[in-house]
Amino acid sequence: MLDVNFFDELRIGLATADDIRQWSFGEVKKPETINYRTLKPEKDGLFCEKIFGPTRDWECYCGKYKRVRFKGIICERCGVEVTRAKVRRERMGHIELAAPVTHIWYFKGVPSRLGYLLDLAPKDLEKVIYFAAYMITKVDIDSRHRDLPTLEARIGVEKQQLEDKKNADVETRQRKLEEDLAQLEAEGAKGDARRKVRESAEREMRQIRDRSQRKIDDLDRVFDRFKNMKVQDLEPDELLFRELRDRFGQYFEGGMGAEALQHRLADFDLAAEAESLRETIRSGKGQKKARALKRLKVVSAFLNTRNSPMGMVLDCVPVIPPDLRPMVQLDGGRFATSDLNDLYRRVINRNNRLKRLLDLGAPEIIVNNEKRMLQEAVDALFDNGRRGRPVTGPGNRPLKSLSDMLKGKQGRFRQNLLGKRVDYSGRSVIVVGPQLKLHQCGLPKQMALELFKPFVMKRLVDLNHAQNIKSAKRMVERARPVVWDVLEEVITEHPVLLNRAPTLHRLGIQAFEPQLVEGKAIQIHPLVCTAFNADFDGDQMAVHLPLSAEAQAEARILMLSSNNILSPASGRPLAMPSLDMVTGVFHLSRVSEGAIGEGRFFSSVAEAQMAFDAREIHLQARIQVRLRESTPPAEWAPPADWLPGDPFTLETTFGRCLLNEALPEGYPFINAQLNKKAQAAIVNDLAERYPKIQVAATLDALKSAGFYWATRSGVTVAIEDVVAPPNKAQILDEYEQRAERVEKQFGRGFLSDEERRSELVQIWTEATNKIAEAMEANFPETNPVYTLVNSGAAGNMMQIRQLAGMRGLVSNPKGEIIPRPIKANFREGLTVVEYFISTHGARKGLADTALRTADSGYLTRRLVDVSQDVIVREEDCGTERGILTRIARKGPDGVLVRDRYAETSAYARSLASDAVDAQGEVVVPAGADAGDVVIGQIIEAGIESVRVRSALTCESRMGVCAHCYGRSLATGKLVDVGEAVGIVAAQSIGEPGTQLTMRTFHSGGVAGDDITQGLPRVVELFEARSPKGKAPISEVTGRVKIEETEKTFKVVIVPDDGSEEIAYPVSRRSRLRVREGERVEVGAQLIDGAVDPHEVLRILGPRQVQLHLVDQVQEVYRSQGVSIHDKHIEIIIRQMLKRVNVLESGETTLLPGELVERARFEGENRRVVEIGGQPASARPVLMGITKASLATESWLSAASFQETTRVLTDAAINARSDSLVGLKENVIIGKLIPAGTGISRYRNIRVEPTDEARAAMYSVSGYEDGASVEYGAFGAGSGQAVPLDEFDYRSSGDYR
């Protein structure tokens, strides 16, 4: 087999008949599969052992040779080679066709490649291929020209002969008539009889003349057709064609079916055609030019590659290996078979019948019909259903053809090449393990034993508990006591990977050190639940085992959960205290007024601990404590003689002293009440300042303290804890009266329905807020429900309002607010009507969530596809450029404060230029990493904006460079070379997709003014679609004039430079952003609404459209409170603007109208300019992510994304070569991905094991029988059951 590591690129092309015969190991001549009695393959059939290899290892068909020692011998009796059975997965056969057929991909695809090449309409092409019309394939123009006078004379003579014969015939008839009349007269017949005879004779003479004239006309028609005949003419009239062939057969050739096309392609002059097309492009206009451009693409593809157009017509069909289209016996003795066998059988049957008809010399019409059926059979085999009705199997199910095998989620690409099931894995339900450390997980003993089985067996043999692997295996299966001790030893320091589906971002798979636990559930640490988005209501997780030393090292160093505290999307910690932990820490840091022991002094925390143990002080009592080892809090005012490092006395509580013991040494003492936000801020600060190990230890300490004190805080919720405000009825009365007044005014006709609605909505919104305030004021501090909300542990005030205040206004299915409020709360209970109108919103919410999940998943898939080859390829690209970002703004008091968006824009980037203050002094040099501390320094120096490096300005030819990307948000350090930043970006944008809303907001019930928001808006931006009702932007600088007509406004801009005025018609409903006489700059938005990004690109250029898109995407995410760093969005947008559209090709090899990557365009121009030629010109193009993914240079990546057959057709014609730079291409062919530790600079390092390591190496393979089993490149040996398409082996999916 081919070793994937020995080639660097993969080319696809058209196979000729000779190629197919070369691949083949023999011709399949019979449609038989296996013998019904012996169940062995039939000779020369679809499963023939002679062609495809033996069905049993080292055994021929007739059984003469059985054993490895006969390896390589070909049995002289049955002709089968003695070899391994797995060759049946790789050996191909072929079918020799009795008549050529066209390949349906090239004729039926859109656009039809065959049609473009031959300049034939697809309809005409179909007529020829399916035997409905003849096609002229060759005309001998010279001899026709030479012999034309002779032929004309000959035709003239023939016409004269016809004329003479007609005259003679008419004359004879005339004579006969006269004789008849004379005879009748002699007999004395009546005039009536004589008239009848005369009419009959005249009719006959007329027929003679007509017949003769018709023959002469036919002669003229045949001769005219012959005179004007040219190659590629179609002739649907069979009689006319036969006449032509009989008379002038030596001057032309013609035919029908694929054979005619084959002759045509054989004589096709590509170079001449390309030259004439180039001439058309130079001189032509409009449609003609556009068609010539499209045709030139196809013609030049054949011209510039080794492909021959003859490859589009097949003389023989390849037969794929039998183990890839298996036939297996089911329990009932029936057989299940792959659809391909049925399709191949149809081809073979029709082919054999056609051969027989040809041998018999059957009439042409019968043979042509059989040829047509053969063509249709091959079409169905390649792409069933592409033309006409699909071939169906039992139960009217369309059969799966070769194309269907590749397409879609269940196709070869996505099901088997990009995602495989792996060994050494298990899955189980998860439960919480509060006793675990952050880097640990609890693994059920039985599962661990099964996962680590080979390691345990090897160790048992090493420790002499077992004689050989076989007995060790028996020991493990019987679970002897010694096995558990060995298991304990084997799993120490051997990390396992845990994964929870759906894996939306890289934190969905993390490594943990396993701890053996009883039971059958996996235990996970409570702090990693956020990253996995896991809860314990029945979620399941999968466990995978890294086997090799390298895999274990990577799992431990890169994937261990304690090394993944930060979110890759925002760079802030994800492992935050939540729920009970928040409650516990909140309880610890609280102060109770007048509690036991208030005001006492203690000389140390230990003394306070004694008092607490003796129950002399309350946890939350205010006490004075002398602290020695701590750093005082920032707000503490030190006495005059105090020096840093001295002990100090602080008014605090014993709880806060305990809390500070959980924090690292030297961290300022925290003397405040900590709700969730404050706790998050502390974790955030720790992550910025301390190493990861310390942060993980602190988090564990906080977790333990949180759980311990949450238990002891006694927070419980009873129904009496939901306290409704006592004055609720009075508040409601007041608003009831106001609402009544509005209803009366409406009844009298003072208000329109619209006004009444908005008034009522306003009144009841006020009422709801008033009641919420009263309710909040009414809650006692110590109320458990209030504590839960106040600490941030669970719920929010809106939910409490619904429990204890009033539910307020709800919306109907259309999304409009119903002006009747729900006055009750859940504590009192709703009336039936109130309950009923509540159900609208609830039901819509659930339906929305289901739709959103699917849409969000699809968006993530497209984002991954467009950005998968963006990898950090170099340290520094050396660019001077960057983008200007705002880092601070003036507060209300005129002091600079940090800009609220600095978190997602300037944070974690490298500075592109020095940050210089007003005095011209450098505060921070270029190249520095803008962390929180650096940003603080810059703001202190009074600088408002800085220039930072960005992926948008990076000049790396492939991927991005480390400095332009800046800090890796997941690690907090400068990004490593080899980091797959594109995929991280796609995950960071896609993962919160499910949190975005689906709705289109209705502004005041006006249908036309919907503003698209949420997920659909993000999709609209990334797909670069023109938004509905787009807002125009000014193309010039000038003054505004506004003209009103009945239906529209016209915004007219009078340019400053005196050129022609530009008018923008806008609807009267739109809100104008400009006033009469106002001066506007280029690119100013004229009305409210979404701007078309293509317009921004055209008017303001690529940089502005990049910033516009980043800003617009961020707007959607910010509105939902999701924090994503700009750099992720920039990477996607960089991919959208990677290509240019060639306008003039100059002397380059580029074609006008072609989309090429900017790097290739610049390289080609550089080459042409160096030799003194004329360079090409182009303009930048903004492509949506789907289109950009399909336009990628890598055909493997594009084919595995969407439109598989179209991509492969195109790639094959262009003989495209995939240089394997992205991730998907390498996964597909089974190479290490060129990212992370797979990039070449890491792959070239060899690690030599020490002697101890060599001794301790565990062998993993072949523990079944002690022998080393060689597995081929296609997976396990033939003993394995093959899942068939008929049975739906769906993956278990997400059980949540």
UniProtKB/Swiss-Prot annotation:
Required cofactor names: Mg(2+); Zn(2+)
Record field: catalytic activity: RNA(n) + a ribonucleoside 5'-triphosphate = RNA(n+1) + diphosphate
UniProt-listed InterPro entries: DNA-dir_RpoC_beta_prime, DNA-dir_RpoC_beta_prime_bact, RNA_pol_asu, RNA_pol_N, RNA_pol_Rpb1_1, RNA_pol_Rpb1_3, RNA_pol_Rpb1_3_sf, RNA_pol_Rpb1_4
Biological process annotations from GO: DNA-templated transcription
Superkingdom, taxonomy of origin: Bacteria
Binding annotation for Mg(2+): 535, 537, 539
Transcription keyword on record: yes
Gene3D superfamilies noted in UniProt: 1.10.132.30, 1.10.150.390, 1.10.1790.20, 1.10.40.90, 2.40.40.20, 2.40.50.100, RNA polymerase II, clamp domain, RNA polymerase Rpb1, domain 3
Keyword annotations from UniProtKB, A to Z: DNA-directed RNA polymerase, Magnesium, Metal-binding, Nucleotidyltransferase, Transcription, Transferase, Zinc
Cysteine pairs bridged by disulfides in the record: none
Enzyme class label: transferase
A GO molecular-function annotation: DNA-directed RNA polymerase activity
Region: Disordered, residue numbers: 188-209
Residues the entry annotates as binding Zn(2+) 1: 60, 62, 75, 78
HAMAP family, sorted: RNApol_bact_RpoC (MF_01322)
Function statement: DNA-dependent RNA polymerase catalyzes the transcription of DNA into RNA using the four ribonucleoside triphosphates as substrates.
Record-stated family: Belongs to the RNA polymerase beta' chain family.
NCBIfam families in alphabetical order: PRK14906.1 (NF011498), rpoC_TIGR (TIGR02386)
Quaternary data: The RNAP catalytic core consists of 2 alpha, 1 beta, 1 beta' and 1 omega subunit. When a sigma factor is associated with the core the holoenzyme is formed, which can initiate transcription.
Protein name, entry field: DNA-directed RNA polymerase subunit beta'
Gene this chain is encoded by: rpoC
